[in-house]
Amino acid sequence: MPHFLRFAALLGGLALGCANLAQARDVDAASYGYPLTNPFEATIATTPPELRPELPHSEDIDQKDYSLKLRPEREFALPDNFWPVKKLRYRLARQDHAAPLIFIIAGTGAHYASSFPEYLKKLFYQAGYHVVQLSSPTSWDFMASASRFATPGFSSDDADDLYRVMQAVRAQQRDLPVTDYYLTGYSLGALNAAFVSHLDESRRSFNFKKVLLLNPPVNLYTSVSNLDKLVETQVKGITDSRTFYEVVLSKLTRYFRQKGYVDINDAMLYDFQQSKQRLSNEEMAMLIGTSFRFSAADIAFTSDLVNRRGLITPPNYPINEGTSLEPFFKRALQCDFECYMTEQLIPMWRARYDGGSLTQLVNQVSLYKLQDYLHDSPKIAVMHNADDVILGPGDLGFL
């Protein structure tokens, strides 16, 4: 998924300023110039260091974190150990002059300050934008402090929550000189961005000039199903007495021993995959799937707790800063994203919106819902990778 970053550097300077990017264009592998052909490897290692653009260092960016109190009623309803997320935090990087502002929506379960929003922030800041980084509606901080129903996955609701956050950011930063508004998101954040842009067509608060969707899921159910299945991958060397984590840790240990030092970063991951200790396809698939399972567990746990559903945490169970949440998180780890949809999202959708079948829900939360808008709007630009693991049959044709 993350191997869009090299092309995003080009898009950052060009795409948002172009007049019309609605025409689809395939880029062959040779012209693309990306050296990793394995989609799992590209997802984990990201763009090789030598292909990354020169970007400003964090200390050279005028930036600051801010907080918003959007759900004051939850301040006393949430457990004490949720104190860090009773207010929604975001990051603003400002230019020293009037400039366009771009909102960046993080991917599945991601915090506003995670690695991809940080990368995109530097990219667009260097191009002259004010930049606002927002957490994903599926992150526990957003769910607790900004989401009305704390049950992410119904895209229209998620877009409404994001839109309210963006309006609150603009109100809080009323003295910031903004010439135009832009919007981008990656992975699930790109799907969110599409729905936010569509919402803005009727509410007209921002009149986004351009919207850039980076590697969006087309069919949300297909995407999460593909990722859920990765955790079931059969990996050589894993037995009842030797876990997947022990296999990966032993490989990393041998790698660092040969290197003579320990330094974990994106460049290291790329170099690691060029070494003899490199992860196999099965190990990489398991690693990606496991990461997604942790995100799904976070969503299931937080949604259940905020709404007092009692599926994971007993509704009246006393939780304070000293309470261990490990038993509940272990229970949440047994629930993949499809389980979360079945037990929490679909019941909420049916109760609140008189929803029907799973097929109806999938059509309402996926890009299919916006097909005419995406086709007709000249402001929407999409960048995707043909071998992205979140895509299913027919998805590229849709784009």
State each model region's role.
Residues 376, 382-384:
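Short beta-strand/loop motif that positions the catalytic acidic residue
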Residues 199-323:
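Alpha/beta-hydrolase-fold enzymes
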Residues 93-140, 393:
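Short, surface-exposed "cap/lid" segments of acyl-processing enzymes
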Residues 362, 389-395:
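Conserved alpha/beta-hydrolase "acid-adjacent" motif
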Residues 351-372:
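Active-site nucleophile elbow and catalytic-triad environment of alpha/beta-hydrolase enzymes
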Residues 151-173:
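Alpha/beta-hydrolase active-site loop
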Residues 184-193:
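Gly/Ala-rich beta-loop-alpha elbow adjacent to hydrolase catalytic centers
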